[in-house]
Design a protein with these regions (language model features):
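Domain-scale detector for complete catalytic domains at protein termini or as standalone homologs
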Residues: 2-105, 112-257
Length: 257
């Protein structure tokens, strides 16, 4: 395996499927467990790297890069959660043994991607050992409405003001301030696309049994603890909800990126 970059114990690889779907990876077929990490809206595989230093060397890490983002910025952008999940599932089936222990993890949009991928993997015969869903409810129903409100916590067509507020809340506004107008427009358009993708996804109830661990901030108004508890209905396996101090990006209270 050729590595051009090493950060947080993870190599940037240029080798078959790892280089395309998982550009930043700590992949080793001999490791007992691999953690597949999905980015939140506006983020890329690079955003997931700090997690690798937390889980330790014993666990393999595969950081997902969606088409049109990060190292795959020259590709046409993927538009649906289902399409991302299908690509990741195909890649994992090709590189993983069916006996491998694989855990899906993601925050907000990443949680939607993690659940959908885990569900598609189960159908493909590579059922995950567990799923960690952070900062996202399966749906939310507004008062007085008979229709599920498509989760995502943003307007149907988020404008630039909303997007800049989002960047400030995620601690990314300073980085975007240093960009030129063309680069800033690219960042905002990509973020808008990701938020709409998240909002448009409503998970299906499927006969899956993988363990599910949900985390959310006690002050999160997008994915409230009560709304996240509804994930209990989406697996016949073990379920646990953990609430932590903070809002939607509660993990920043703990020094995590």
């Amino acid at each position: 395996m050729k590595a051009d970059d090493v950060r947080y114990g993870v190599v940037m690889v240029h080798d078959f499927l790892l280089s395309e779907v998982f550009p930043y990876s700590r992949f080793d077929p001999e490791k007992a467990v691999h953690l597949v990490v999905f980015p939140w809206a506006g983020a890329s595989a690079l955003s997931c790297l700090r997690l690798c230093s937390v889980v330790g060397e014993a666990v393999g890490v595969l950081a997902v890069e969606m088409a049109g983002r990060g190292t795959r910025g020259d590709e046409p952008a993927v538009r649906t959660v289902e399409d991302v999940a299908a690509e990741v599932t195909s890649a994992l089936v090709d590189i993983m043994d069916t006996s491998a222990l694989v855990v899906m993890a993601g925050h907000s949009l990443g949680a939607a991607l993690a659940y959908e991928t885990a569900s598609q993997m189960s159908v493909a015969g590579l059922a995950p050992a567990g799923v960690i869903l952070s900062g996202r409810a399966p749906y939310r129903v507004p008062s007085g409405s008979s229709k599920p409100w498509k989760c995502g916590g943003c307007p149907e067509r988020p404008d630039d003001v909303y997007l800049m507020d989002f960047l400030r809340n995620t601690g990314s506004a300073d980085e975007s301030a240093s960009l030129n107008e063309y680069q800033r427009r690219e960042v905002l358009d990509r973020l808008r696309s990701d938020l709409v993708m998240n909002m448009d996804y409503v998970p299906e109830l499927r006969p899956v049994r993988f363990p599910m661990f949900c985390l959310t901030g006690r002050e999160d108004v997008i994915a409230t603890p009560e709304a996240c508890r509804a994930w209990r209905n989406y697996t016949a396996g073990y379920f646990e909800l953990v609430t932590l101090a903070g809002g939607h990006f509660y993990f920043r209270n703990y020094g995590a990126e």
